[in-house]
């Protein structure tokens, strides 16, 4: 927003300098980006009255003028401007004057000179020569009542400053001189003076029929007829100056008045040519296919999401954005209809951008404009029109349809003090609210504030706390380093955190990655067997169109990324959410009805099992390497690995991970068909686990340090080739349950497997030999041989009963 300081000071004039005013506005949240002078420095330029104009005797394009510059004698000045004439008043640079610097950056000093033999004692100036504008078609002609000899800087108020303020979207109440003046008054305590908005004399009874059909578009609509205006009337110089210094251009008196009041009071309005309106006006949503030629010359096609104002024949305006060309006022307009309304912000937001333009009116309405002062502002517009353009005014037709109902906002003083980090008393808060003009009551420690009709940014407690901070002064809040006053909490030894899991995986030589939760539809089908993934309504890219239900796709993609960059060994892991449909999930603080969002941890290993080292034979990572990583991650939990099939994994080299009878994840080699599809030279091994299932590890159980060595027995069992090792281990655990020696059993571990190429006397063609090491230990005394033997035999019998196992001869 841009405005001249003099205009602001006509509303509120605190006894502070420009720099201090700029600083206070900035510290209150109205960031002053620039403060620029209206005109560059120059001196000895006064108002001159051209008394006589004669042709130059030796130049067709030059004139010899006699000018009264208030010096007591007429000055002879040679001038080449085409618009010089007797009787005009123009800026006159006296001998010794310094004009603004030119392109070379040096000031231009006026001296007595000769032009084609005629002496010139000064210079008549254009606006461009004074750096007031780019207009260079002739001299800058001043009003007739301008005093001769007066300093041009004072006459044109050229010592004024232009403020350029960068407003945040919530400060729509400051998109006017009145709004900024309210802030200055609150910050400095200076009284505010408003322009008169007394009702004008109503001399007509005419009303234009208006029907509001869309209360969700327009909450209040008001307007009046004014007849007999002179649209060719000249806009007063003071108004033109203020409009131009606010960054707008002067168009015509009627348009200038509408723009002036918008800048002054923040009230966008529209002036229709009454004689071009057919019948009455209707405020409604557009109909698909309707077209409108706008004031900017563009023709737009509307639909039922765009608000319009129409007459009986066609639409005449885009509601709250821009008027139509058909009913625009011209210099021949005699009768007008002045309209002002409250448009709901949600009904205006984004509409102008659909047509690739923006307007000052739309910028204000989409943020919220005061709905309570519409009539007063129409009176202000009417008074200016009658004063400048003449005419007769009819009554204001004010229709209140659906204005916002503002709920009181409560602010706890104690909470405000805690948020701001400063002590706050009731007196301080009360003073701030009074300076802001907020109506409030006090209920104990709580201030109950009625939000003003022009403050759409006050809705919750934090908004009021912000107001207290702004007016109290951010610079008065002491700068202190943040102090985290954390109470010591006991560590839950029965659970480990997500960070513990991440550190544990990283310790196994995996590197963490963070992938998008948005994946390709194809990945879901390939790696999760999910043919109905959760789609995204507005994906950031076509390949990220669905939510992932597995981490495998992203991990595999990053392996390919690294392989394309000549990496030979890649070990990655990720901890993140996956998404799946679940009708049992209800809405909650962090949940969405119908969708489960569990946390998973997954990893992938590709290439050599270990980094290249001269003393270690090179070999590719396999299922059992990664199984060891998973077992290490799960420790002290003991998991079962059950053979199973998964759409992403090799059918013979995949296992389901089971904890306490519950499936918590998968591990396996990537399926051969995906190796070819995704162009991988060799198969990586992948794994994925439910994070919640592996964080509960239970309390550690402490045991006495053994005083005697452990006893081991090795047994080799011959079983059918389809018998799984895990099944045998389960049989051993079942046999040990309840036995006297169970407490001594430390473990049964497979240490060898043998499959003969051909049948032998000891092992058949469809059999294999599995060698287990049984470890027993008592912490106090050496175990007796008979107990060890009994335990060993019982385990052998259990394997024989369950799977027909026999000792290998």
UniProtKB/Swiss-Prot annotation:
Binds 2 magnesium ions per tetramer. InterPro entries: aa-tRNA-synth_II/BPL/LPL, B3/B4_tRNA-bd, DNA-bd_dom_put_sf, Fdx_antiC-bd, Fdx_antiC-bd_sf, NA-bd_OB-fold, Phe-tRNA-ligase_IIc_bsu, Phe-tRNA-ligase_IIc_bsu_bact. Its EC number is 6.1.1.20. Keywords: Aminoacyl-tRNA synthetase, ATP-binding, Cytoplasm, Ligase, Magnesium, Metal-binding, Nucleotide-binding, Protein biosynthesis, RNA-binding, tRNA-binding. GO terms for molecular function: ATP binding; magnesium ion binding; phenylalanine-tRNA ligase activity; tRNA binding. It catalyses: tRNA(Phe) + L-phenylalanine + ATP = L-phenylalanyl-tRNA(Phe) + AMP + diphosphate + H(+). Mg(2+) binds at residues 457, 463, 466-467. It is an enzyme of class 6 (ligase). Its cofactor is Mg(2+). Residues 39-153 form the tRNA-binding domain. GO terms for cellular component: phenylalanine-tRNA ligase complex. Residues 404-479 form the B5 domain. It is found in: Cytoplasm. Its main location: cytoplasm. One of its GO terms (biological process) is phenylalanyl-tRNA aminoacylation. Tetramer of two alpha and two beta subunits. Belongs to the phenylalanyl-tRNA synthetase beta subunit family. Type 1 subfamily. This is Phenylalanine--tRNA ligase beta subunit.
